[in-house]
């Protein structure tokens, strides 16, 4: 993994920030913020989408055990529908960073846009492949959101949330047509809105 050069205090209290769940039709957007310990590097950190479930689970445990600070933030379905998915994602990331203790001196955020934060923040395209702290955040966020979607699958059976995690797969779209929308669905997303309009 290429790492971006940092120096001084920022390298110690640098938060990596990422979110998961912008594209799904159901469930919250979950963000994570992580401050890694530079004296305890964690091998194998990379974009969560490129890791097996078993490897993500193992790294999730190691990150939580070795990081200086970790925090999760979320934006609920009602907030996504009220704000829009971009603003809800920014809100989830702000909440994740606000939960860090100690507070970061700098934040590096995956993507092309960073939320307004109480510390300097820089957006980094493909940051989850370039910055270990962002990769760590992507792993924690994905693990947390996947667990939430498995719980929603038990609460709302028949949609297959445990398999597609709310993304608009053929299975999910068919279930929407057959069962209609459940409270976990994002009403502002076109496929759900079409279903509600009949």
Curated annotation (Swiss-Prot):
Pfam families recorded? RNase_HII (PF01351)
Q: Name one GO cellular component term.
A: cytoplasm
Q: Where is the RNase H type-2 domain?
A: 12-198
Protein residues bound to a divalent metal cation: 18-19, 110
The GO biological-process annotations, alphabetized, read as: DNA replication, removal of RNA primer; mismatch repair
Question: Which top EC class applies here?
Answer: hydrolase
Where does this one sit in the cell? Cytoplasm
Cofactor entry: Mn(2+); Mg(2+)
InterPro entries named in the record: RNase_HII, RNase_HII/HIII, RNase_HII/HIII_dom, RNaseH-like_sf, RNaseH_sf
GO MF annotation: an example? manganese ion binding
Highest taxon of source: Bacteria
Q: Which reaction does it catalyse?
A: Endonucleolytic cleavage to 5'-phosphomonoester
Q: Quick one: where is this thing mainly located? A: cytoplasm
User: Sorted alphabetically, which keywords does the UniProt record give?
Assistant: Cytoplasm, Endonuclease, Hydrolase, Manganese, Metal-binding, Nuclease
Cofactor binding note of this UniProt entry: Manganese or magnesium. Binds 1 divalent metal ion per monomer in the absence of substrate. May bind a second metal ion after substrate binding.
The EC number of this protein is 3.1.26.4
The similarity annotation says: Belongs to the RNase HII family.
The UniProt function text for this chain reads: Endonuclease that specifically degrades the RNA of RNA-DNA hybrids.
Put simply, this protein is called Ribonuclease HII
Q: What is the lineage of its organism?
A: Bacteria, Pseudomonadati, Pseudomonadota, Gammaproteobacteria, Chromatiales
